[in-house]
Amino acid sequence: MKAENNSQKDNLHPRNLHRSRYDFELLISNCPELKAFISINKHGIETVDFSNPLAVKTLNKALLQTYYDIQNWDIPKNYLCPPIPGRADYIHYLADLLAETNNGKIPEGNSVMGLDIGTGANLIYPILGNSIYNWSFVATDIYKTSIENASKIIEANPRLIDAVSLQQQTEPRFIFKNIIIPEDRFTFTMCNPPFHASAEEANKSTSRKVSNLNPKEKKNTNPVLNFGGQNAELWCNGGEIGFITQMIYESVKYASQVLWFTTLVSKKENLSSIYKTLKKVNAVSVKTIEMSQGQKNSRIVAWSFLNNTEQKSWKF
């Protein structure tokens, strides 16, 4: 299952609302504070400074308000600020995956229950999943501040109150343990795992991003503050492959309670190891869904312990 190539913006999913250039006039009409961050680039096109964290956060606020009817979205300083178009792609490709075992029809409504691992202070996946397909979510995080901020977003948007529940993972060494209980039944799990294996590696990567976005700027002495992200959002022992490997092993215990386990995989070189681990735990179905946003290529790896008959009999 591979993302379609197309000549439009960023090769985004065909149902993604952000395939065209940003309509800044529309965005500013809904979020006037965005106007202060708009400038004209060398090609005479309106843009924002993507190396400015406040500009990116305000753009996100405007996008969420304009296209997803989310009010008063905000995140604390130094927390990860997600790019909305790419996050929406994960949701849309998940919808396509679910449609495969639902007679080609995307299941919508609150009976579709997702588990978002590491939702962050931004709560972005539950927001998008509920706004686009009316799905329900359990959203988890190890940080109390993230849970508290996500709770504020929910309280400011009545449609989310009954659709999204929050749960703090009190034992950070675990992913699903303490979260999935015997009576739970999840249509899917999703995760954007920590990318790096150390804080030093994360800092170096962020420095490169800042330099690439704004090469004229002097070297930033604290680059992580530009892009945001708490430690567990950016790195963990073992990096991306370590986190995903643990997730796969933990998923075995909940094999009959989840239709599809899924995760983003940023590093293509990790796929071989992931496939070997999935074979080792006897995953019945494994799918790789390629995605592309601009110059960035990533993919979703999805696995299920249910056979084809069990998948098709899953009640949405």
UniProtKB/Swiss-Prot annotation:
Its main location: cytoplasm. InterPro entries: METTL16/RlmF, rRNA_lsu_MeTfrase_F, SAM-dependent_MTases_sf. SUPFAM superfamilies: S-adenosyl-L-methionine-dependent methyltransferases. Keywords: Cytoplasm, Methyltransferase, rRNA processing, S-adenosyl-L-methionine, Transferase. Residues 204-214 have a biased composition (Polar residues). Belongs to the methyltransferase superfamily. METTL16/RlmF family. Specifically methylates the adenine in position 1618 of 23S rRNA. This is Ribosomal RNA large subunit methyltransferase F. It comes from Flavobacterium johnsoniae (strain ATCC 17061 / DSM 2064 / JCM 8514 / BCRC 14874 / CCUG 350202 / NBRC 14942 / NCIMB 11054 / UW101) (Cytophaga johnsonae). The gene is rlmF.
